[in-house]
Design a protein with these regions (language model features):
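A conserved short coil-to-beta-strand element within the FAD-binding core of flavoproteins
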Residues: 106-120, 233-245
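Helical element adjacent to the flavin cofactor pocket in flavoenzyme catalytic cores
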Residues: 86-104, 110, 138-142, 216-231
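Glycine-rich active-site loop/strand segments that organize a redox cofactor
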Residues: 35-90, 194-210
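C-terminal, flexible cofactor-proximal segment of oxidoreductases
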Residues: 270, 287-368
Length: 368
């Protein structure tokens, strides 16, 4: 069995960003394993989907590019693009992995992690590895939330404009629902969105709750150009049936909607479906239980990183949010390993707003 001090599962933005930060904290012997290739989830985005956070090379002025995973990189600088496609962002991740000479083993699936005598045993397609620390960076894109018997999930669609039909029904009311609606409207089809709630007109300033300006602007432009998009709020779907070449969407209020095209399910993702999450973390009311250090409450030295981390009102679903935890966790590991503390390095991360050690500072308030 091959032993590594740090074992990171997932070679996406979180996994690679964490590895780079550990490297900067002089923590060696880090292995990253990925079931596909680097940036696997990004490569499977719909072709029209782009980052909703804009990239801009702000490095050097207190905050790196919002989509950067390391403080001295910038996708905007690399590609001269503001909103980046999934395939392009995966290319950025590959460039960064090469630049920092990260140890990444691709096309390697992890089936199980067990804790034996203070050491983690990680079962993979290529045998068992052992490790002292486990970082789960698998994200949620591989685990779509699809609670219905019929319907096509947003993540399963490669090109919206190639779908056949003159009318489509979308279940869901946030980013992916509006992205699907905007793209489908380009074909001239009539789009009906049904949702129990939406971030479209939320008063909350937090972009994890409120619909992003990028999507708001795209929606406004589409409607001004004649897009046929209808919004129905207060409709919670509980069942989708299919009979006589027609889909029926059943809502809690008794309303039934008929659709001749397969409904598009834009209900997000459910990371608790991940077998590794089930093995290593406690789940209560569909929420992963974490300590204030993003550590498992079941096992020591097992951390969750990336967009699936939640702490009360702090939702780390954007790269610029969750990357701020990398240095905090790297610092924690260095202390547990008895390594010398580099206060100047910590300060450099603080100066770049990439050292979030207090979740109580995450309230987003705007006066206007």
């Amino acid at each position: 069995m091959s032993h590594h001090r740090i074992f990171i599962i997932g070679a996406g933005a979180a996994g690679l960003g964490m590895a780079i930060t550990l490297q900067e904290f002089n923590i060696k012997d880090v292995l990253i394993v990925e079931k596909g290739t680097i940036g696997h989830s990004f490569k499977h985005w719909p072709l029209s989907t782009k980052t909703i956070t804009p990239s801009f090379t702000t490095n050097g002025f207190g905050m790196p590019d919002m989509n950067a995973i390391a403080k001295d990189t910038s996708p905007a600088f690399t590609f001269n693009e503001e909103h980046i496609s999934g395939k392009r962002y995966a290319e950025y991740l590959s460039l960064v992995a090469t630049h920092y000479n990260l140890n990444v083993k691709t096309n390697t699936n992890v089936s199980r992690v067990t804790y034996i005598d203070g050491v983690y045993h990680v079962s993979t397609d290529y045998g068992v590895y052992t490790a002292d620390y486990i970082f789960i960076a698998t994200g949620d894109y591989s685990f779509p939330y699809h609670p219905f018997s019929y319907g096509r999930h947003y993540s399963e669609i490669q090109t919206f404009t190639q779908l056949k039909g003159d009318a489509f029904t979308i279940i869901g009311g946030n980013e992916s629902a509006f992205d699907a609606a905007i793209n489908l409207s380009q074909t001239g089809a009539r789009i009906s969105i049904y949702t129990s709630k939406t971030g479209l007109k939320k008063e909350d300033a937090d972009p994890s709750i409120r619909l992003s300006p990028y999507t708001q602007q795209r929606l406004q432009n589409a409607i001004q150009e004649g897009a046929l998009i209808e919004m129905h709020v207060g409709y919670r779907a509980h069942k989708v049936t299919y009979q006589d070449h027609s889909y029926k969407i059943h809502f809690d209020n008794g309303h039934i909607v008929h659709s001749h095209t397969e409904p598009i399910i834009a209900t997000g993702f459910d990371v608790t479906q991940n077998p590794l999450i089930e093995q290593l973390f406690q789940i209560r009311q569909s929420e992963i239980q974490l300590t204030e250090l993003d550590e498992s409450t079941k096992f020591p030295n097992v951390f969750l990183i990336g967009a699936t981390v939640r702490h009360q009102n702090a939702i780390l679903c954007y790269i610029y949010k969750f990357r701020a935890r990398f240095a905090v966790l790297a610092h924690l590991v260095s202390l547990r390993e008895g390594l010398p503390e580099d206060t100047s390095l910590i300060q450099s991360y603080r100066q770049k707003n990439m050292y979030l050690d207090d979740y109580h500072c995450c309230d987003v308030n705007c006066t206007c």
